[in-house]
Amino acid sequence: MIRHFLRDDDLSPAEQAEVLELAAELKKDPVSRRPLQGPRGVAVIFDKNSTRTRFSFELGIAQLGGHAVVVDSGSTQLGRDETLQDTAKVLSRYVDAIVWRTFGQERLDAMASVATVPVINALSDEFHPCQVLADLQTIAERKGALRGLRLSYFGDGANNMAHSLLLGGVTAGIHVTVAAPEGFLPDPSVRAAAERRAQDTGASVTVTADAHAAAAGADVLVTDTWTSMGQENDGLDRVKPFRPFQLNSRLLALADSDAIVLHCLPAHRGDEITDAVMDGPASAVWDEAENRLHAQKALLVWLLERS
């Protein structure tokens, strides 16, 4: 059976743990260990600009002994009038996996519905599951066991990071809180899915408009840009509601004394996070960015071994 990774709950708790364990192993020996069997080609398609996703996937595939074919959709027939389904059928004859950074989640779902190779969500408007695998790897490195930790996210609760942290976090047994202003809350269907998964793992889901309450005693504090790609023209009116949710030294002081800070990047310093926090001793941002490489390599190996 072909396994896809389109959203965080595509992995069971046990499967997520397997991927994270493999990511830790690959990080110990990132170059010489090349576990892909035979020549492997991977299509890496971008509808949106990228730094970390492009470098980490392209280099990671090479380190595994595979070959990445990296294109932007505008340079293919996908950017014109060929259907997603036709593109998926053709690419499935050429490559062993498809990695796609795109807009609506429905585009990934449509491609996966006919692809005969694994399809990986490298970011959509709704989810960012590869990033959250890297986040979980980083948390495990700093904190040890994930189960029972308290993670609080601050900012736009309706964006892809909030959604993926909800699903991926509770899958790992983490208690996840989303602190966001009214009008920017998680999608109800995503929250419901996270609550169902949390029942299986002993985790919990909390959504609040009180940033201070969310920070109190937290083990992990996470934020993301207040203006996602495609929202740049919304102006200052969009930014204003998020000001009380800035991840700054005052908010960090409310958390556990050993708390860590994550940001998937790029950061708008002075908006969602201050320099003092991002560059301070609690920051694990740079480890988090590096772990995109290792977590995605592990995911590719895991999927290809099972497809």
From Swiss-Prot:
GO terms for molecular function: amino acid binding; ornithine carbamoyltransferase activity. Keywords: Amino-acid biosynthesis, Arginine biosynthesis, Cytoplasm, Transferase. Transmembrane segments: none annotated. It holds the Pfam family OTCace. Carbamoyl phosphate binds at S50, T51, R52, T53, Q77, R101, H128, P129, C130, Q131, C264, L265, R292. InterPro entries: Asp/Orn_carbamoyltranf_P-bd, Asp/Orn_carbamoylTrfase, Asp/Orn_carbamoylTrfase_sf, Asp_carbamoyltransf_Asp/Orn-bd, Orn/put_carbamltrans, OTCase_ArgI. One of its GO terms (cellular component) is cytoplasm. Its EC number is 2.1.3.3. Coiled coil: none annotated. It is found in: Cytoplasm. Disulfide bonds: none annotated. It catalyses: carbamoyl phosphate + L-ornithine = L-citrulline + phosphate + H(+). Pathway: Amino-acid biosynthesis; L-arginine biosynthesis; L-arginine from L-ornithine and carbamoyl phosphate: step 1/3. Competitively inhibited by L-norvaline (NVA). L-ornithine binds at N160, D224, S228, M229. Belongs to the aspartate/ornithine carbamoyltransferase superfamily. OTCase family. Homotrimer. Reversibly catalyzes the transfer of the carbamoyl group from carbamoyl phosphate (CP) to the N(epsilon) atom of ornithine (ORN) to produce L-citrulline, which is a substrate for argininosuccinate synthetase, the enzyme involved in the final step in arginine biosynthesis. HAMAP family: OTCase (MF_01109). This is Ornithine carbamoyltransferase.
